[in-house]
């Protein structure tokens, strides 16, 4: 009897140890709402159990704060853009991997002017945005398109959580932000969209970033997250009731209705299948895009004090490495998305 009790206790203990806990954080954005839905519908739990682990999915209202928490080790993975992955965790020395390339912004990020309709009218104005984020990058690309420089405007750092309310102030005349905030701002009187991310396709990617060391030690985490993601994608991308219900839930969670959420999806190049994501990840465009992003980051001092040039941090992809091969801190790894494409998860 004692042996049986000991055996059962050992089995229970081994089961408990096997269910290692991991934490993933996300913030509100059209391309990341599926994580909240997947957690609520227990899809993430299902895939975690399949691989003998536990995954807690946590929503954080402040986007930059979510990345900062990931960078200091509070979370194992976090949703963020390609630029922010480079300039926050990677630049801070945290070796990070793009586990999932979920989409690229195709109009979901934009520059809005109040009472003006041309980018050139922005000269001399204050521009509210999340400083040093992709909104700042978008502003730089917009200014570049009409021969202006950042010195022609004044950037006002504004949290995404406060953006809509602050834009309502009379003295605020320009803002760069992302959806759903962008659509809320555009609904206000005299607001004009003068530049958006559809004019720089593929340059603002939305990713699930994971700590590289954690992923290497726990491939089950990578498999569970990728498996859950593409199950959610298959549900929401259809035209049946299940798809409508899924997108309706995401719409409500992001503060809009189904029509509003579908409008945001229309300006997002969602990669609903792993094959679609792999097409970008395996392309020559990936590293050429990251070169532009790294150059912007270096010009703004975002790669750290030790960075002598834009190539200070190595960025690896299936086609090679941009930057310092001895200091790779951001990796685009197609391994797990390929497993999903091959139906081997």
Regions from the PLM with identified roles:
Residues 1-6:
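Bacterial N-terminal signal peptides that target proteins for export
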Residues 13-16:
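N-terminal signal peptide c-region/cleavage motif recognized by signal peptidases
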Residues 20-157, 166-169, 173-179, 202, ...:
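Short, glycine-/small- and polar/acidic-enriched structural segments
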Residues 48, 74, 79, 89-92, ...:
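Sec/Tat-exported extracytoplasmic proteins
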Residues 61-64, 129-137, 161, 176, ...:
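Soluble non-cytosolic domains of exported or imported proteins
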Residues 155, 162-258:
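Pocket-lining segment of extracytoplasmic ligand-binding domains
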Residues 218-306:
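Secondary-structure end/capping motifs
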Residues 293-345:
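Conserved C-terminal helix/tail region of periplasmic/extracytoplasmic solute-binding proteins
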């Amino acid at each position: 009897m004692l042996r049986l009790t000991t055996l059962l206790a050992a089995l229970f203990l081994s089961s408990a140890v096997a269910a290692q806990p991991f934490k993933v954080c996300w913030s509100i954005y059209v391309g990341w709402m599926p994580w909240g839905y997947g957690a609520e519908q227990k899809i993430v739990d299902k895939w975690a159990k399949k691989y003998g682990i536990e995954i807690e999915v946590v929503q954080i209202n402040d986007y930059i704060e979510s990345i900062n928490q990931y960078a200091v080790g509070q979370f194992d993975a976090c949703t963020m853009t390609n630029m922010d992955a480079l300039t926050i965790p990677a630049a801070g020395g945290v070796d990070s991997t793009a586990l999932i390339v979920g989409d690229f912004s195709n109009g979901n990020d934009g520059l809005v002017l109040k009472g003006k309709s041309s980018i050139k009218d922005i000269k001399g104005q204050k521009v509210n945005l999340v400083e040093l984020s992709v909104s700042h990058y978008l502003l730089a690309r917009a200014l570049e398109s009409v021969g202006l420089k950042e010195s022609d405007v004044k950037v006002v750092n504004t949290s995404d959580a406060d953006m809509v309310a602050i834009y309502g102030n009379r003295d605020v005349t320009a803002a760069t932000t992302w959806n759903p905030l962008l659509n809320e701002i555009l609904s206000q009187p005299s607001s004009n969209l003068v530049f958006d991310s559809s004019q720089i396709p593929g340059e603002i990617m939305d990713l699930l970033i994971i700590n590289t060391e954690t992923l290497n030690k726990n491939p089950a985490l990578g498999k569970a997250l990728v498996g859950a993601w593409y199950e959610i994608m298959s549900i929401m991308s259809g035209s049946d009731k299940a798809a409508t219900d899924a997108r309706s839930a995401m719409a409500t969670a992001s503060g809009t209705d189904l029509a509003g959420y579908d409008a945001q999806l229309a300006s997002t190049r969602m990669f609903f299948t792993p094959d679609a994501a792999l097409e970008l990840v395996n392309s020559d465009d990936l590293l050429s895009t990251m070169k532009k992003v790294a150059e912007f980051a270096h010009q703004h001092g975002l790669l750290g004090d030790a960075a002598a040039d834009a190539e200070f941090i190595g960025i690896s992809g299936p086609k090679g490495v941009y930057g310092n091969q001895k200091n790779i801190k951001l990796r685009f790894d197609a391994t797990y998305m390929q497993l999903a494409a091959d139906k081997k998860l």
